[in-house]
């Protein structure tokens, strides 16, 4: 049920799985926001999980060095004792290794869930169940992985009140482009076509085509209305 940064898996697969859960009658979602996830990864816990699969001490030392790489702030390097370097090539892989514990726990509890990197949604059949699951999973993450759930950004609500990977999922199991995703794309189009940029017409068209192709390719899985209709006006 994990789709982020894994071979032959993608956001479209995560959306398809989520839609299947909703169609089965689980129209309430536990939408968890892990507070500053990449900044708060506990190095010792992560290294203990990695050591379960890797015995090469030199490689383990190299990974630890990667985690401890200092951060440059105001010209000074500060030591890092937790978190992973955002944008680093290993960070997505390491996040999956750490959150595999969460996957196993949710499987053990027989929950219907979809995870994409640190974005995890759990689907249940009632509001009461959603509230109970949010509290219990937050407790698990805090006690076992030293990760904090941001309760002000997390929610136990109807699926159509939240967005997941840029989509809004509806209670009938269909998906549409979320309002925020549409708004961001329109803003990008306005920026590209802004006259004050002083770019040649051909360059503007080339940049606009590139942005449009990428957006439509990602949101081609939307059920209705079509992504093109979203952009009318």
Which role fits each region the language model picked out?
Residues 6, 85, 125, 200-203, ...:
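A structural signal for alpha-helical segments
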Residues 1-161:
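Conserved polymerase palm-domain catalytic core
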Residues 68, 142-207, 211-213:
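A conserved non-catalytic segment of reverse transcriptases
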Residues 124, 193, 197, 216-223:
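Short amphipathic alpha-helical interaction patches enriched in hydrophobic/aromatic residues
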Residues 204-233:
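Non-catalytic, peripheral interaction segments enriched in hydrophobic/basic residues
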Residues 13, 17, 45, 58, ...:
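Exposed alpha-helical structural elements
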